[in-house]
């Protein structure tokens, strides 16, 4: 997952010198390789908490069955409703902060009332990751954006990696924040995108407060089912006696 910065700089300097000397190697175009995380998340995704994902009625029985393992059949329906409600928010940013409060990342208290909006924004219905390229399409399949992205930073607290578009666009698809989750490990991915890299770092403050996308691979029922089971376990295992 890591790229040696100093080695890259030295290599670029050497290539530049060889190009000035007329070396054939200097004329060759250098191709950036995707990071390990970019490779691991390759695929086409839909929002996990959407009718294309875990909110579809076909998953209702699984939600109830999994919840019943931890809280019993009598309380399963209520538990599922609460879990879904936490991730089906309808507002983000300043509106969400007014509603739920502003909290720094080092505040780990989530006991109060809150909702996260976990869906795509800005007209995106599906995201496709292929190598260094990220493409978003709307519900009709029309392209919303498509750019290649390069790693520009990391956040140790969340294990996040930040990527910036190579195309110079200044819009809500300039930066992507990818968390460590991958289909191979947790059956889903978690991410954000936007125009301000610093704002993307704040979970419950600023422009992107209370917005964190959860996504599963489109048409992959095995992933969706496994992600539901994992989500229920993480939220209800403390309730099991």
Predicted regions and their residues:
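Bacterial N-terminal signal peptides
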Residues: 8-17
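Calycin-type beta-barrel ligand-binding domains and close structural analogs
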Residues: 26, 51, 100-241
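Boundary at the C-terminal end of the N-terminal hydrophobic targeting segment
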Residues: 19-22, 26-28
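Positively charged n-region of N-terminal signal peptides that target proteins for export
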Residues: 1-5
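Extended, polar beta-sheet/loop recognition surfaces of beta-rich domains
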Residues: 86-91, 97
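Internal, charge-rich low-complexity segments
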Residues: 50-87
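N-terminal helix-cap/turn-to-beta initiation motif at the start of protein domains
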Residues: 27-46
């Amino acid at each position: 997952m890591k790229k040696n910065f100093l080695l890259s700089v030295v290599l670029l300097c050497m290539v530049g010198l060889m190009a000035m000397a007329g070396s054939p190697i200097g004329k060759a175009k250098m191709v950036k390789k995707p990071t390990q995380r970019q490779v691991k998340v390759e695929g086409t995704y839909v929002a996990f908490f959407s009718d294309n994902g875990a909110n579809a009625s076909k998953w209702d029985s699984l939600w109830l069955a999994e919840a019943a393992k931890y809280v019993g059949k009598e309380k399963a329906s209520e538990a599922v409703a609460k879990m879904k409600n936490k991730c089906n928010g309808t507002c983000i940013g300043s509106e969400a902060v007014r509603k739920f409060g502003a909290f720094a990342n080092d505040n780990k208290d989530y006991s109060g009332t809150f909702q996260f909006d976990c869906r795509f924004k800005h007209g995106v219905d599906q995201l496709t990751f292929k190598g260094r390229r990220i493409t978003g399409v709307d519900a009709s399949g029309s392209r919303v954006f498509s750019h290649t992205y390069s790693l520009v930073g990391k956040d140790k607290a969340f294990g996040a990696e930040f990527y910036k578009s190579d195309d110079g666009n200044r819009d809500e698809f300039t930066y992507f924040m990818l968390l460590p989750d991958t289909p191979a490990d947790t059956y889903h991915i978690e991410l954000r995108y936007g125009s301000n890299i610093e704002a993307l770092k704040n979970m419950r403050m600023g422009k992107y407060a209370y917005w964190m996308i959860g996504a599963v691979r489109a048409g992959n029922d095995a992933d969706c089912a496994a992600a539901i089971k994992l989500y229920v376990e993480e939220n209800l295992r403390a309730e099991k006696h």
